[in-house]
């Protein structure tokens, strides 16, 4: 079992995966790859987090590399131009910081602070250039990352990305509502909400600037392409739930597939873990089947025209990266400090976040 170290070379090192979380098929059939830009990516994103003041300097120094945010993206968007991958990695790092702010706002009951942030993010998404110097560094960092993402493809792609992220913001608001009221959503409601809070279609949209081609709706919505994209994201979300379950139970959270199964289907913890794992394994099996259909679709697009060749190449590259997402997500969960709950002083409080409880920031 190999994973990449936190240094500047891509020499694999052994990582022990707990038996309950180990997926031999991922280790055997989904070889891990890493974008060659990764060492520079890690360094530049670390600098960006400091410059944008998204994390305190001492926490960046101590935790940023070990959180492995850049490793996750560098293992996904293979073939992306360096500039595109850098913009995606910075946006992804911002997303994790936003997720942590959202969590702390819930923990400390900062409803007003969350409401203000929610409104500002909606506004900044539509006009990032007007928010680059906002007093809330989270808003300014978001504006910077979105402005850069908007530079790669036509305005129609930007509008779709914005539309998808507006729904993500609203899904985070629904999660805020549920968690502050102790509401555990039913399984189907949770699965629908999880597709939004995990930003399934955002990460799928970002495959397009990575391959340098905006896909027309007829291609993007083709059943094989769309199903492959969904399965890769479902795997990531549900494997995240499997790995996060101890942390989220310790933190009295309510948003986890395992917690919904325990609450609404009367499963024991052991049974819930087994059911989440079963769903994770089904995603892998079904992806391996639909991947063939998606690649066959890519071949069909190559109709002898220049445009057909471009679309065929883009779909093939994107489906290859959907495959990469499985291995990148898998190893991320066993390398990143986000999931090393047993090493924290307080299992309910990540050491890499600002846990300021006073006031509404």
Curated annotation (Swiss-Prot):
Catalysed reaction, written as an equation: (2E,6E)-farnesyl diphosphate = (+)-epi-isozizaene + diphosphate
> EC number(s) in its UniProt entry?
4.2.3.37
Per its Swiss-Prot or TrEMBL entry, what cofactor is needed? Mg(2+); Mn(2+); Fe(3+)
Q: Does the keyword Lyase apply?
A: yes
Among InterPro entries, the record links this protein to: Isoprenoid_synthase_dom_sf, IsozizSyn, Terpene_cyclase-like_2
Q: How is the cofactor bound?
A: Binds 3 Mg(2+) ions per subunit. Can also use Mn(2+) and Fe(3+) but less efficiently, and other divalent cations such as Zn(2+), Fe(2+), Co(2+), Cu(2+) and Ni(2+) are nearly completely inefficient as cofactors.
Q: Where does Mg(2+) 3 bind?
A: 240, 244, 248
> Where along the sequence does the record place the motif called DDXXD motif?
99-103
Keyword annotations for this protein, in alphabetical order, are: Lyase, Magnesium, Metal-binding
Which pathway does UniProt place it in? Sesquiterpene biosynthesis; epi-isozizaene biosynthesis
UniProt binding sites for Mg(2+) 1? 99, 103
Task: Check the record and name the Pfam families matching this protein.
Answer: Terpene_syn_C_2
MF GO annotations: epi-isozizaene synthase activity; metal ion binding; terpene synthase activity
What family is this?
A: Belongs to the terpene synthase family.
Please explain the role this protein plays, according to its UniProt record. Catalyzes the cyclization of farnesyl diphosphate (FPP) to the sesquiterpene epi-isozizaene.
Q: What is this protein called?
A: Epi-isozizaene synthase
- Organism from which the protein derives: Streptomyces coelicolor (strain ATCC BAA-471 / A3(2) / M145)
- Gene it is expressed from: cyc1
């Amino acid at each position: 079992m190999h994973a990449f170290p936190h240094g500047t070379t891509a020499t694999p090192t052994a990582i022990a995966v707990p038996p309950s979380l180990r997926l031999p098929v991922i280790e055997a059939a989904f070889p891990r790859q890493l974008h060659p830009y990764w060492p520079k990516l890690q360094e530049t994103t670390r600098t960006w987090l400091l410059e944008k003041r998204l994390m305190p300097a001492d926490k960046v120094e101590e935790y940023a590399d070990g959180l492995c945010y850049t490793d996750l993206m560098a293992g996904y968007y293979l073939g992306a131009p360096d500039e595109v991958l850098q913009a995606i990695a910075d946006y992804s790092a911002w997303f994790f910081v936003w997720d942590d702010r959202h969590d702390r706002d819930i923990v400390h009951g900062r409803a007003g602070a969350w409401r203000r942030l929610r409104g500002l993010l909606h506004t900044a998404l539509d006009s990032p250039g007007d928010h680059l110097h906002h007093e809330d560094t989270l808003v300014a960092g978001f504006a910077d990352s979105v402005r850069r993402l908007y530079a790669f493809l036509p305005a129609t792609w930007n509008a779709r990305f914005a539309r998808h992220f507006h729904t993500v913001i609203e899904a985070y608001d629904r999660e805020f509502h549920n968690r502050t009221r102790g509401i555990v959503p039913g399984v189907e409601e949770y699965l629908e909400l999880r597709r939004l809070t995990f930003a399934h279609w955002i990460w799928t949209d970002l495959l397009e600037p990575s391959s340098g081609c905006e896909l027309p709706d007829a291609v993007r919505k083709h059943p094989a392409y769309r199903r492959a994209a969904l399965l890769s994201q479902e795997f990531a979300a549900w494997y995240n739930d499997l790995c996060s379950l101890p942390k989220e139970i310790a933190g009295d959270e309510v948003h986890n597939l395992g917690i919904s199964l325990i609450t609404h289907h009367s499963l024991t913890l052991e049974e819930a873990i087994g059911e989440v794992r079963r769903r994770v394994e089904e995603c892998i099996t079904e992806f391996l089947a639909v991947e063939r259909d998606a690649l066959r679709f890519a071949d069909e697009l190559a109709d002898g025209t220049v445009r057909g060749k471009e679309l065929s190449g883009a779909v093939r590259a994107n489906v290859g990266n959907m495959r990469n997402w499985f291995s990148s997500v898998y190893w991320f969960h066993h390398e990143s400090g986000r999931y090393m709950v047993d090493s924290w002083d307080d299992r309910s409080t990540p050491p890499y976040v600002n846990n300021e409880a006073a006031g509404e920031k």
